[in-house]
């Protein structure tokens, strides 16, 4: 099977270790187990005693019930039988395509987005059609263009909400209109929702699974809950044919997700409100820092993110984004992601949810590099 190189991951793998100012990171500032117990008030001794007494078997093959129950609390209409645990959201996306998409199937995906959403189905021989998101439309899908791309042969529409890399957020009304387009073709909607709940304004972030019977939500413990080291995600859907197919295909390459990961994730999700409060505080304070910097730096511009942890920032230098980001890294230690990883030239993705001082110092380093190039 041929597949395009995963541009973002190859870039991160090559440069992340050793970065002086890591503002390419997309998870909310990660926490330790000690931090988790302190934040949640969970009894560490009691938890560790239960964990140490647990036999290290495969565990619950279809997922620890307490973990799946915790995941259900992130939605309005799901029960534990609607949840399929996976190794991260990347594993969840892969399992959805592996389970549902065949050669010749028509798949419509937005761009820019996480590359999995178009490169994996393309590698399986799907007819992948791209719906380009524009800066002029605040990176929201143009519904007329989507209608033209969706045909009776369309098997799946792939979206990402909130969007990576732009931070755009689709409203419930917009999602409902996309649902009607999908329903006209009896197509699934796969929505990568790893940044859901991280909006800049208070209120419930709608999920595709609460709006559409053929909606498939993918998420994880990594971005919002700062627990990427657990490598634990999930597929959520009301469509039990999808659940059945994903579990069947999962038997071939995953079996189960691991006793330790699911126990710790279940403990975290019992106290999700406390973790979400921490994460929202970080992204809201840090976005203000980023917004102030964009306003003061004459050579950059962006559409201010509505949610998530990332922003797509344009620069006005006549230099490719790979060259810009690599040279800047070597000269200043500032680590960002080239926009060309998302097929958006003359831009960079900045992750603003990591350490506040890293963000401040990293943005200063970007300004120093730009000043160096524009003298």
Specify the residue positions occupied by each region the protein language model found.
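PLP-dependent enzyme catalytic core of the Aspartate aminotransferase-like
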Residues: 77, 147-148, 318, 327-336, ...
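N-terminal small-domain helix-loop-helix segment of the aminotransferase-like
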Residues: 2-88, 270, 373-375
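Helix C-cap/helix->beta junction micro-motif
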Residues: 124, 184-185, 297, 332, ...
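Conserved glycine-rich beta-strand-loop-beta hairpin in the small C-terminal domain of fold type I
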Residues: 266, 282-291, 302-315
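Active-site phosphate-binding strand-loop segment of PLP-dependent enzymes
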Residues: 135-200
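Conserved PLP-anchoring active-site segment centered on the Schiff-base-forming lysine
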Residues: 81, 99-121
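Structural signature of PLP-dependent enzymes
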Residues: 243-250, 268-291
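Active-site PLP attachment segment
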Residues: 211-244
């Amino acid at each position: 099977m041929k597949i395009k190189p995963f541009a973002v991951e190859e870039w991160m793998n090559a440069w992340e270790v050793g970065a002086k100012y890591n503002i390419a990171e997309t998870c909310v500032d990660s926490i330790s187990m000690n931090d988790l117990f302190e934040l949640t008030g969970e009894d560490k001794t009691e938890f560790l005693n239960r964990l140490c007494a647990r036999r290290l078997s495969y565990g619950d093959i279809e997922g620890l019930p307490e973990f799946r129950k915790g995941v259900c609390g992130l939605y309005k209409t799901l029960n534990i039988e609607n949840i399929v645990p996976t190794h991260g959201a990347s594993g969840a996306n892969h399992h959805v395509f592996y389970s549902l998409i065949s050669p010749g199937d028509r798949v419509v995906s937005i761009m820019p987005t996480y590359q999995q959403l178009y490169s994996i189905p393309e590698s399986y021989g799907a007819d992948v059609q791209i719906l380009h998101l524009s800066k002029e439309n605040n990176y929201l899908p143009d519904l007329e263009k989507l209608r033209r791309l969706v045909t009776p042969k369309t098997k799946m529409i792939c979206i990402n909400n909130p969007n990576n890399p732009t931070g755009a957020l689709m409203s419930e009304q917009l999602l409902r209109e996309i649902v009607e387009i999908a329903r006209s073709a009896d197509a699934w909607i796969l929505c990568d929702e790893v940044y859901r709940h991280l909006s800049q304004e208070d209120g419930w972030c709608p999920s595709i699974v609460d709006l559409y019977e053929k909606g498939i939500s993918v998420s994880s413990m990594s971005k919002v809950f700062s627990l990427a080291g657990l490598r634990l995600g999930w597929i959520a859907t009301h469509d039990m044919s999808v659940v059945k197919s994903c579990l069947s295909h999962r038997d071939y390459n995953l079996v189960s997700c691991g006793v330790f990961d699911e126990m710790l994730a279940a403990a975290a999700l019992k106290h999700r409100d406390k973790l979400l409060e921490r994460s929202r505080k970080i992204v809201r304070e840090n976005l203000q820092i980023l917004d102030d910097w964009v306003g003061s730096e004459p050579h950059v511009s962006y559409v201010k993110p509505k949610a998530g942890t990332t922003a797509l920032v344009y620069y006005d230098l006549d230099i490719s984004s790979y060259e810009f980001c690599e040279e800047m890294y070597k000269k200043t230690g500032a680590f960002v992601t080239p926009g060309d990883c998302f097929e958006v030239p003359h831009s960079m993705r900045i992750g603003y949810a990591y350490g506040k001082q890293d963000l401040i110092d990293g943005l200063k380093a970007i300004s120093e590099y730009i000043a160096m190039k524009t003298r």
